[in-house]
């Protein structure tokens, strides 16, 4: 049996921009993608802590060091600049492997700076 497990998350990211007219996605600073092990074009869930909204989209790379978390396309209606969000990815694995699996968790602080990564 395969279980769907959390692969990685960016916890308490701050939305820096929302662009309704840009083709869908969430732009994430390449440093943050690397820290979490999230790949460009990987499916992500975005959980808006500020409003409770949840949506699925895909990640694209924003310039390294920019601290950008930018929600694009239709999903931009579900966030506003300065909202706090969690970005989560998942993977599937056998139940036996899942018992000993540890996801990557990147905790962010003000300015989308990495506070802790594990």
Swiss-Prot record:
It is an enzyme of class 4 (lyase). It is found in: Cytoplasm. One of its GO terms (cellular component) is cytosol. Heterooctamer of four alpha and four beta subunits. Pathway: Cofactor biosynthesis; (R)-pantothenate biosynthesis; beta-alanine from L-aspartate: step 1/1. The modification Pyruvic acid (Ser) is found at residue 25. Keywords: Autocatalytic cleavage, Cytoplasm, Decarboxylase, Lyase, Pantothenate biosynthesis, Pyruvate, Schiff base, Zymogen. Catalyzes the pyruvoyl-dependent decarboxylation of aspartate to produce beta-alanine. This is Aspartate 1-decarboxylase. Binds 1 pyruvoyl group covalently per subunit. Its cofactor is pyruvate. SUPFAM superfamilies: ADC-like. Belongs to the PanD family. It catalyses: L-aspartate + H(+) = beta-alanine + CO2. One of its GO terms (molecular function) is aspartate 1-decarboxylase activity. Substrate binds at residues 57, 73-75. GO terms for biological process: alanine biosynthetic process; pantothenate biosynthetic process. InterPro entries: Asp_de-COase-like_dom_sf, Asp_decarbox. Is synthesized initially as an inactive proenzyme, which is activated by self-cleavage at a specific serine bond to produce a beta-subunit with a hydroxyl group at its C-terminus and an alpha-subunit with a pyruvoyl group at its N-terminus. The active site is at residues 25, 58. Its EC number is 4.1.1.11.
């Amino acid at each position: 049996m395969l279980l769907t497990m959390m692969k990685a998350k960016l916890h308490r990211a701050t939305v820096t921009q929302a662009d309704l007219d840009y083709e869908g996605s969430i732009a994430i600073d390449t440093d943050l993608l690397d820290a979490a092990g999230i790949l460009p074009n990987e499916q992500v869930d975005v959980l808006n802590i500020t409003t409770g909204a949840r949506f699925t989209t895909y990640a694209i790379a924003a310039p390294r060091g920019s601290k950008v978390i930018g929600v694009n396309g239709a999903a931009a209606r579900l966030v506003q600049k300065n909202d706090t969000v969690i970005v989560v990815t998942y993977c599937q694995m056998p139940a036996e492997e899942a018992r000993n699996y540890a996801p990557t968790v990147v905790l962010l602080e003000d300015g989308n700076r990495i506070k802790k990564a594990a």
